[in-house]
Curated annotation (Swiss-Prot):
Active site annotation, chain numbering: D170
PTM-bearing positions, type Phosphoserine: S215
Ranges annotated as biased composition (Gly residues): 11-30
Organism, scientific name: Mus musculus (Mouse)
Function statement: Dual specificity protein kinase activity catalyzing autophosphorylation and phosphorylation of exogenous substrates on both serine/threonine and tyrosine residues. Regulates the cellular cytoskeleton by enhancing actin stress fiber formation via phosphorylation of cofilin and by preventing microtubule breakdown via inhibition of TAOK1/MARKK kinase activity. Inhibits podocyte motility via regulation of actin cytoskeletal dynamics and phosphorylation of CFL1. Positively regulates integrin-mediated cell spreading, via phosphorylation of cofilin.
Family membership noted in the UniProt record: Belongs to the protein kinase superfamily. TKL Ser/Thr protein kinase family.
Name by which UniProt lists this protein: Dual specificity testis-specific protein kinase 1
GO BP annotations listed: establishment of vesicle localization; negative regulation of cilium assembly; nuclear-transcribed mRNA catabolic process, no-go decay; podocyte cell migration; positive regulation of protein localization to nucleus; positive regulation of stress fiber assembly; positive regulation of substrate adhesion-dependent cell spreading; regulation of actin cytoskeleton organization
Domain notes: The extracatalytic C-terminal part is highly rich in proline residues.
Cofactor(s) needed by this chain: Mg(2+); Mn(2+)
Composition bias, Low complexity: 316-330
PANTHER family: DUAL SPECIFICITY TESTIS-SPECIFIC PROTEIN KINASE 1, LIM DOMAIN KINASE 1
Binding site for ATP: I58, G59, A60, G61, F62, F63, S64, E65, V66, K81
Length: 627
């Protein structure tokens, strides 16, 4: 049909971006320029919200809501990741640009971009098995070969990602998705919103650590301490995921024992592992959780170890015989954390198709598992106020400009080079433009100061408040000399991380807003040199929109709706192609000012000090009546 839009789809496993099954789109024997192929691929990947139906909400995160949708023309089922924060569009664009360049069976497949009211929303493939965390918490029996295959899939995806010069920084069992097939399960790695270029450590360069970001339960100890870190932080997170696979317990320290220095408590963890667990699999998980980053093996070696362990596993048949040899381990066994396994585990019975952890129900939050001793275990994440028990997500703010991550392998380092940090090129970027101030021009200062005089330390238990706009450029009050700059977001702690609310304790008038299904707190980094604000102002101040979602009060029905700020195409979905002549995203006309400027009217109503005591002066007399 003439004028019919081509169906939305992503490139195949062997296709390059912009190429379809028939080549570049010009027929056999006709070559097309690369700009044409890039333009065709970009336009065919664009969609609108009206192009989909049968939306079903299947999840929600800190920044987005996930929907299962079906394309009306092609009938293809996909996942629409709707961005909730307008200020998070830079991170969304970075994730879209990175996923558009990744092609691997164990990396979540990118399908296209949905543009709606100036916002970008990613379209990915639908995984019918949910997340790995959901699979492990279900009563689904998982044999050891199945768990080894899942671990191998994740390791292969991360090996491919690291080979491209990028590391994940937020690898969790929540971000690993599972596909159910007739032959078994397949795991893929998703959620690349915090991915970063692998830093190259060289001598003689400035040491500047990367931002402290990620989910605390899976973050490496060096990241939580604010030290220099690299792609080996993903290896530690992978070790925590392996512990979840082996014991089928959540990563919460109430179930997965941890040490006070954020390491793995190996003796306590061994009490959760059955005798049928393959010993090399257990040792590999312990090795990945090593406290020293340099002793953790890269994913090229981890995938080899997992393949060797799988070769030693017998087939899932009742008459299978146990193997005579165990899988060789070439990694350094001295890198095991304190209290490593001192005794060899008994060889598992290969006739069992189900592991010992499958025979018990998933742990209940009301009854944490017993670890075989009478010692009181302490959650190390609850000892630091900035981590709030670990049930938050650490983010980097302000959002970086949308610059494509270079997909080039990192230069190999010799063993004699010292791990010195250089500032990645992706960090040297101009600041993003601040949003226009939408506050009332002549609003009095009293309501803004009243928040510091509230009786309670916590915010009011009302609904969501209006997000705080950046109005620093138009502030009439100069900064007093000799004082440290005040924090616009929250108070900087000793570890230069500040929190917005707690997610580990029930709500009270002094602990923050009420809890919901999603993790209610988002932690952002603050510069180390900022001082504390007086009067505990940070407990009542709102963070920027890039850190926490705030919704504005709904305007009256008669008021015109203010359109979202348009996003120019050279910096959004077509940014990687650098087309200066193309503009695909809608740019609505500027909105009319929401409030009247009352500066002229308010001037006559103000009573200035010193003038109210003057006696009234007589005015001119009116002429008298004449006969």
């Amino acid at each position: 049909m003439a004028g019919e839009r081509p169906p939305l789809r992503g490139p195949g496993p062997g296709e390059a971006p912009g190429e379809g099954p028939g080549g570049a789109g010009g027929g056999p024997g006709r070559g097309r320029p690369s700009s044409y192929r890039a333009l065709r691929s970009a336009v065919s990947s664009l969609a609108r919200v009206d192009d989909f139906d049968c939306a079903e909400k299947i999840g929600a995160g800190f920044f987005s809501e996930v929907y299962k949708v079906r394309h009306r023309q092609s009938g293809q089922v996909m996942v629409l990741k709707m961005n909730k924060l307008p200020s998070n569009r830079s991170n969304t664009l970075r994730e879209v640009q990175l996923m558009n360049r990744l092609r691997h069976p164990n990396i979540l497949r990118f399908m296209g971009v949905c543009v709606h009211q100036g916002q970008l929303h990613a379209l990915t493939e639908y995984m019918n098995g949910g997340t790995l965390e959901q699979l492990l918490s279900s009563p689904e029996p998982l044999s050891w070969p199945v768990r080894l295959h899942l671990a191998l899939d994740i390791a292969q995806g991360l090996r491919y990602l690291h080979a491209k010069g990028v590391f994940h920084r937020d690898l969790t069992s929540k971000n690993c998705l599972v596909r159910r097939e007739d032959r078994g399960f397949t795991a893929v790695v998703g959620d690349f919103g915090l991915a970063e270029k692998i830093p190259v450590y060289r001598e003689g360069t400035r040491k500047e650590p990367l931002a402290v970001v990620g989910s605390p339960y899976w973050m490496a100890p060096e990241v939580l301490r604010g030290e220099l870190y690299d792609e080996k932080a993903d290896v530690f997170a992978f070790g925590i995921v392996l512990c979840e696979l082996i014991a089928r317990v959540p990563a919460d320290p109430d179930y997965l024992p941890r040490t006070e220095d954020f390491g793995l408590d190996v003796p306590a963890f061994r009490t959760l592992v059955g005798n049928d667990c393959p010993l090399p699999f257990l040792l590999l998980a312990i090795h990945c959780c090593s406290m020293e980053p340099s002793t953790r093996a890269p994913f090229t070696e981890i995938t080899q170890h997992l393949e060797q362990i799988l070769e030693q596993q017998p087939e899932a048949t009742p008459l299978a015989k146990p193997p005579l040899t165990k899988a060789p381990l070439t990694y350094n066994q001295g890198s095991v954390p304190r209290g490593g396994p001192s005794a060899t585990l008994p060889r598992p019975d290969p006739r069992l198709s189900r592991s010992r952890s499958d025979l018990f129900l998933p742990p209940s939050p009301e009854s944490p598992p017993s670890w075989g001793d009478n010692l009181t275990r302490v959650n190390p994440f609850s000892l630091r106020e900035d981590l709030r028990g670990g049930k938050i997500k650490l983010l980097d703010t302000p959002c970086k400009p949308a610059t494509p991550l270079p997909l080039v392998p990192p230069s190999p380092l010799t063993s004699t080079q010292l791990p010195l940090v250089t500032t990645p090129d992706i960090l040297v970027q101009p600041e993003t433009p601040v949003r226009r101030c939408r506050s009332l021009p002549s609003s009095p200062e009293l309501p803004r100061r009243m928040e510091t005089a509230l009786p309670g330390p916590g915010p009011s238990p009302m609904g969501p408040t209006e997000e705080r706009m950046d109005c620093e450029g138009s502030s009439p009050e100069p900064e007093p000399p000799g004082l440290a700059p005040q924090l616009p977001l929250a108070v900087a702690t000793d570890n230069f991380i500040s929190t917005c609310s707690s997610a580990s304790q029930p709500w009270s008038p002094r602990s923050g807003p009420p809890l919901n299904n999603n993790p209610p707190a988002v932690v952002v980094n603050s510069p180390q040199g900022w001082a504390r604000e007086p009067w505990n102002r940070a407990q009542h101040s709102l963070p920027r929109a890039a850190a926490l979602e705030r919704t504005e009060p709904s305007p009256p029905p008669s008021a015109p709706r203010e359109p979202e700020e348009g996003l120019p195409c050279p910096g959004c979905c077509l940014g990687p192609f650098s087309f200066g002549f193309l503009s695909m995203c809608p740019r609505p006309t500027p909105a009319v000012a929401r409030y009247r400027n009352l500066n002229c009217e308010a001037g006559s109503l103000l009573c200035h000090r010193g003038h109210h005591a003057k006696p009234p002066t007589p005015s001119l007399q009116l002429p008298g009546a004449r006969s």
